[in-house]
Amino acid sequence: MKIAFYDAKPYDRVWFDEYVIEYGYKIKYIESRLSLETTILAKGYDAVCVFVNDTVDKDVIDELSEMGVKVVLLRCAGFNNVDFESSYKKLHVMRVPAYSPFAVAEYACALLLSVNRKTHRAYARTRDYNFNINGLAGMDLHGKTAGVIGTGKIGRIMIDILHGFGMKVLAYDLFPAKDADFEYVTLDEIWKQSDIISLHCPLTLETTHIVNEDAFEKMKNEAILINTSRGALIDTAALIEAVKNRKIGGVGLDVYEEEDDYFFEDRSNDILADESLVRLMSFPNVLVTSHQAFFTKEAMQAIARTTLDNLQRFERGDFLLNEICYQCEDKGSCDREKSQVNCF
C-alpha cells in the first residue's frame, strides 16, 4: 500500500523508514501540510498520514475520497482537526491513542520545575557570565496542593510524579476513574485550592476554554499553570490579562491556541504576526515551548509502529482497533469495541 505522508519532518523519516520495510509499504514524504490545495499530492495513494496541524475538513475529505484514498492515519492521539461526520463511510480514520504517556507527563513536570525554579532564566544568565540569583527564588513543591484536570493515562502518571514530590493531589475528570488513589473534586475546588494546575484532558466542546477569566479569578495569585495537552483548553486573552494583573504566579505552555502557523516551524527570521503569542513570550514568568512533550525516542518508535499497524489492519480486513468515527464518544471510542465491528 502507498502512503502520502504530510507535514513530514526529518525526524519522522528516521523512525518510519526504520519500520516501513517490514510492512512492504511505500511512503512519499511531503513537507507541506494537508489542505485542500495539497490533496492533489495524494492522488494514486491508498492512505494519507497526518499530524495535529493538518486540515482534515469536509472539503479535504471529499477530495481525498474522490481520488481513491481510503484511510487517514493520524500519527498522534488528538483528533480535533478531523471532521468525523464528513469522513463517515468515506474514509477510515485511525489514530495512535497512546505512544508514550510517560513522555508527556515527564515533560509537564519538567515545565513545572523550570517555571517554578526559573532554570531557563538562570541558564540564560550564566551563558552571559551573570551568576546573580536575584529574582530566581521558587517554592517547595513538597506539601503543596496540585490540581490535575484529566485523569487518563497521562494524567494518572503525572499524579504519580506529583505524589513523589510529596504533594497533595486533587483531580477533575468528566469520566472519573473508579480505582483512583486520589481525590476527585469540582472544578471550582481545583481553581481555589491548587498551588499547581496541570491540564491533561482532550479538547472537546466541554473543555474548550475550560481555563477562562472566571477560573483565573478563583485561582491563587501564586498558582502555576501547566498545559501540555491542547492549546484551546486555555482562553489566551484571559491568560494574558491574568498574567498582566498578577492573578497567576507562572505559566508553562507546550501548546498554544493558535499554534498552527508557528509550532514545528523555524520562524527565527520572521516577524511574528500573532500579537498574543508575542505578548505571552514577553512575560518573565511564562515559558513557551513548541509542542514537544511527546518527543522522545520511545514515543516516536511507538508512533511509527502503531501507525503502520493501523494500516496493516485495514489492508487485512481486521478489526480497526484504533479507528474513530463520528459516533464515538469524546474519549475516542464507541460500542464497536465490545462487538469488535468496525465503524463501517
Regions found by a protein language model. Give the residues of each.
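Phosphate-binding beta-alpha-beta segment of Rossmann-like dinucleotide-binding domains, i.e.
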Residues: 89-145, 157-160, 164, 326
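An N-terminal-biased, well-structured beta-alpha scaffold segment characteristic
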Residues: 2-94, 212
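Rossmann-like dinucleotide/phosphate-binding beta-alpha-beta segment
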Residues: 134-221, 341-344
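Rossmann-like dinucleotide-binding domain for NAD(H)/NADP(H)
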Residues: 222, 232-344
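Short acidic/histidine-rich motifs immediately flanking catalytic phosphotransfer sites
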Residues: 42-47, 67-69, 192-197, 220-223
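Short glycine-/small-residue-rich Rossmann-like dinucleotide-binding loops
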Residues: 52-53, 195, 201-203, 229-230, ...
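A short helix->loop->beta-strand "cap" motif at the edges of active sites that frequently abuts
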Residues: 66-71, 89-91, 167, 221-223, ...
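Glycine-rich nucleotide-phosphate-binding loops and adjacent flexible coil segments
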Residues: 226
